[in-house]
């Protein structure tokens, strides 16, 4: 008799939307499938893709119809005829465990509802370390109130809570939730490097080896720290040897473009293979985020042996054991960023040593098979405790 299990993973957003939760969901599902289990991803159909899709590795993707609130950042299911048909088909599947990624989306309740229908105690994995921000004090207050309201409602349901980092565990305490442990973000470092498109961004942009290249990859939104990063670039604009390469898109794109800084190159939204090539063409990676659960970008830069310049957000405690693993910003300010850029630029040997040490640590400690095993244990424990209550 087969011991394989079926894991149903709920994530409000999924690829091609770019984000850490989306990548976490994909990699977890693939790792479970590679280990002999079945995985079904249930998400929102933000991009009008096929409603039900089976990938070559057997992973199924179910895309529920949705209202695309905030440009798709906050999708809410449309419970129309298509939704009812999809959910009925999903409910008819043999499902052993339910995993819900993040607690503050209405989509999370879709997972909890299915779990209750199946008599399953779900696990909820938190990916944050601070409230969401839209860059407006008034809107941010409303978003925080919304997050608290959704979380209070979710807490009424039976579930075990986990987080992707120690910082996320501590953030759950803000909502009166005690995390049962860490199910950390991970990366297949070797496969990530192999996936590179091979583009030579230095050559394409006419940047010689004497130029110190600092890269950024992520959404152009306030919480990613794009504004202080541009302030730092402006302070360094008179120094011709430092150049910032920015990959991504978002609401603050026009503000960044409007600066017209000579040492900033906007590359637009890059495909994953080009992101790898960008990191491999860089000297350092900067992510002055306000909030991260466990930054996927930080793992990716580590996989490429690139020294990070990063704020003390989720994942930093796990990855950067001390200053020999990276450069920790005391706060997300231009002055702090400039300080660390200059430190690395002036000491190439230190720059290289940090990257090599971080890369070795990530390869040894942060693999997806290991995280998938932890998820299996968490799901089994959740349902074992339920039957013994």
Language-model regions, residue ranges each:
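Membrane-proximal helix-turn-helix segments that form the acceptor-binding/catalytic region
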Residues: 113, 117, 130, 142-161, ...
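Aromatic "clamp/platform" in nucleotide-sugar-dependent glycosyltransferases that forms part
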Residues: 290
């Amino acid at each position: 008799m087969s011991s394989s299990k079926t894991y149903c993973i709920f994530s409000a957003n999924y690829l091609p939307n770019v984000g850490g939760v989306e990548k976490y969901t994909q990699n977890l599902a693939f790792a479970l499938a590679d280990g002999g289990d079945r995985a079904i991803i249930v998400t929102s159909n933000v991009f009008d893709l096929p409603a039900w899709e089976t990938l070559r590795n057997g992973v199924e993707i179910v895309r529920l119809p949705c209202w695309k609130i905030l440009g798709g950042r906050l999708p809410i299911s449309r419970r129309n005829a298509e939704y009812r048909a999809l959910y009925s088909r999903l409910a008819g599947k043999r499902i052993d465990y339910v995993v819900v990624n993040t607690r503050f989306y209405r989509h999370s309740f879709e997972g909890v509802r299915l779990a209750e229908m199946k008599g399953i105690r779900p696990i909820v994995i938190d990916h944050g370390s601070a409230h969401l921000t839209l860059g407006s004090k008034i809107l941010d207050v409303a978003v925080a109130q919304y997050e608290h309201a959704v979380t209070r409602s979710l807490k009424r349901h039976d579930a075990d809570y986990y987080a992707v980092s120690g910082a996320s565990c501590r953030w759950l305490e803000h909502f009166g939730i005690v995390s049962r442990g860490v199910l950390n973000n991970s990366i297949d470092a070797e496969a990530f490097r192999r996936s590179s498109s091979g583009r030579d961004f230095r050559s394409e942009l006419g940047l010689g080896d004497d130029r110190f290249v600092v890269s950024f990859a992520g959404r152009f939104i306030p919480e990613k720290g794009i504004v202080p990063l541009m302030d730092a670039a402006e302070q360094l604009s008179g120094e011709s040897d430092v150049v910032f390469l920015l990959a991504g898109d978002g609401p603050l794109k026009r503000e960044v473009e409007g600066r017209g800084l000579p040492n900033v190159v906007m590359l637009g939204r890059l495909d994953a293979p080009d992101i790898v090539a960008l990191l491999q063409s860089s000297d350092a990676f900067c992510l002055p985020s306000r909030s991260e659960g466990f930054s996927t970008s930080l793992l990716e830069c580590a996989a490429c042996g690139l020294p990070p310049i990063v704020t003390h957000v989720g994942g930093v405690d796990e990855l950067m054991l001390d200053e020999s693993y990276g450069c920790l910003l005391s706060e997300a300010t231009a002055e702090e960023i400039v300080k660390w850029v200059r430190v690395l630029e002036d000491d190439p040997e230190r720059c290289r040593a940090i990257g090599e040490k971080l890369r070795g640590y990530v390869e040894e400690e942060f693999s997806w098979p290991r995280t998938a095993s932890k998820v299996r244990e968490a799901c089994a424990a959740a349902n074992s405790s339920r039957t013994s209550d």
